[in-house]
Every structure is written in C-alpha cells, then in structure tokens.
C-alpha cells in the first residue's frame, strides 16, 4: 500500500502580502482595535452611547471639602457662561471646554472644578482634597478667585458647602453639631448600609450657604463621589422644584375669580339648554332677544377660555418642571438608602413633610387649570351646538319658505302663460277676420 495522503490544513497560512487583507477581513486593525464592516450607521449612535457616560462621578478620598453653586440662566446666557468659564481656565492654564459641552471637569491645582449645564441652570462644584481643622471654616470656594466668583452668570439659587470628615477620625460631637447647625432643624441619617452618616439642617447660614456634613465609614472614592453627587443634586433639585410654589400661590386667586365666572356662565348655559330650542332667558319674550343672549354667553365663555389658556401657557412649564424635579429627588433619596438615627428625621422624612405638600399644591393648581379649561370648552361647545341647531332650524324654515314662494311663482307663471296663449289666440283670430273681410271686398270668395 502507498503512503497515506498528507492531512489537509484546514487553516492554511495566508500568502505573503495577503496578511493585512486577511486581518482587515477579520476586523483587526493596528493597536488591537477591531474594525467591523457595518451597514450605514445612525448619525446619533456614538452620541447616544456617550451620553450615558457624559457626567461621571468624581473620585473623592476623604477628607474633602466641596462647594456647589447653581445659577438660574436666562435666555441667551450660553455664551456668557462659556466666556466666564474660559476666563478661569486661561487664568490657571487649563484647556477650556468646547462651547457646546454640557459637562466639564478639570484639575486647576489648588482645587478641582466640575461644571454642568442643565436645561435651565448651570452648576459649579469646587472640590479640594486635604485635611481641615473645622468644617466650613475655610471651604473649597475660598480657593476660587473672588472676582470670578462674584461675576458668575445668572442668579444664584443654591450655594452649599459639603465637608467630608476623615475616615479614621471620631464622629462629630454634639457641641460641634450645635455650632455648625440649627439644632431644631438638624437632620441625621445613616447612608448606604452604614457606609456613611450625614448631618444637615437645610438652612442658609450666615455665610449665605447651606451645609452638609458627611462622616464616612466605608466609602471608597467612587462611592464617596456618588453619595456626594446625590446629596448635592437633592439640594439643587429641591430649590428648583419649589420654584413652582410661588407661581401656584400667585395664580390661585385668579383661578378662583375665573372659576366663579365660569360657574355662573355654565349655569346660565344649562338653563338655556333645559328650556328647549326656542326657550328664552330671564323672561325674554322674543326669539331675537334669546339668540342675542346666547351670542353674548358664547363670547364670555370664549373670553374665560382665553384667560385660562393664558395662565396655563404662563405657568405650565414651571409646574411640569417642579413635577420632574420632585421625581428626581425621590429617585436620589431612594439611591441613598437612608436609615433612621434615633431622635432625628431622615432627609426623606423632612422633605416628605415640607416639600411634598408644596408639590401637591402645584399639582392641585395645575389640575385645576386643566379641569377649568375642559369645563369652559364643554360649556362653549354645548352653547355653540345650541346656536348651530337654532341656525339650522332657521335655515330649514327659510328653505321651506323659499320653496313655497317658488311653487307660487311657478303657478303664477303657468297662469300667466295660459292667459297669454288665450290673448294671443284671440288677437290672432281677430287679425284673420280682418284679413278675410278685406279679401272679400276684392271679390275673392272669402266669407268671414
């Protein structure tokens, strides 16, 4: 028997010069980065993926001091915010962010700055690592240039200091807490499964800032950054959610006035409808007077609807924003996983007692505006239907009258035509008679 055939190599080595082509076919390029031959990609594919990582948490190693400022931005304030931030970057030799960036974080040497731009506000968070003697005595914001801080664009709605104590140090004693916070308003809770403890009183102190004191027990840098970020977001969103409360109080009396007028017009409209298609109002004895009153009622209902829509367009954004901020606050509180400390309220309990009623007021006013708008629309539609029905009946009567007149005109025309035929026949016979007499006088045998 001959030698067995050589085994076939199922994976032959590529020919020289074809190795690069094969690597590219397999999706390999330089530096181990894979390149795939996709069909046409969606233009937002990378932008949407990067959005999930656009605002990473800061890495915080206690002890750390943090200051945050949230400023309300007006229309067209974008360029001013960028120029203001760019001036600080140039002062410290830091590359400024792109004009359209909504998030920026950089090390400025004495401090680290985190900037975020939201829909209606911008936030500046200053971080400084290192030991400190007394919390809030020399906060992180003191390391910002004073003139830069004072020229910050927009209106300050939140200014807050956060002090993170050393892990190995003792817990703050009652005397220190009494010096730092208002005892009657002090809130205290354990966070994230006994990983930290937080104290705050949610008040503005003499330096114009709120205060949060955090004692870490088991907080790795990434987790510490998440906890501080959530506490700061709760503080900011709390104030922005409460912006809807003054609007709700302002619009309340106007809604009461409009509601009273709407109730009166609705009652009169119902009285009209119940009186039947030909019914009168307040003893009016003619249909013209009733129709005139219906037109007046319709105009007044349209005016009330316009007032309701004016209020709705002015305040609906604020109420919707408050509802969205409140939902974010509840989400952040859930993420903190607070546990009660005997004798103190948690942050969630405090906000449930104080913030939740304010949000219910905003929701009540918003629902009231929507309800009044629907009521005014229904009343106007009801009255408009009645007016349209009466107009339709009037049109039917007019058409019937026109039909009767047309029939009378037709009969008259037929009568006139019959008389005309008789008259023409009479005159024709007369003419024939005259002609016959004339012909007989000429001797023709014609006998009329």
Sequence positions of predicted segments:
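Structural beta-strand/beta-sheet cores of well-ordered domains, especially the beta-sheet scaffolds
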Residues: 65-67, 120-122, 210, 360, ...
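Juxtamembrane "helix exit" motif at the C-terminal ends of alpha-helical transmembrane segments
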Residues: 425-447
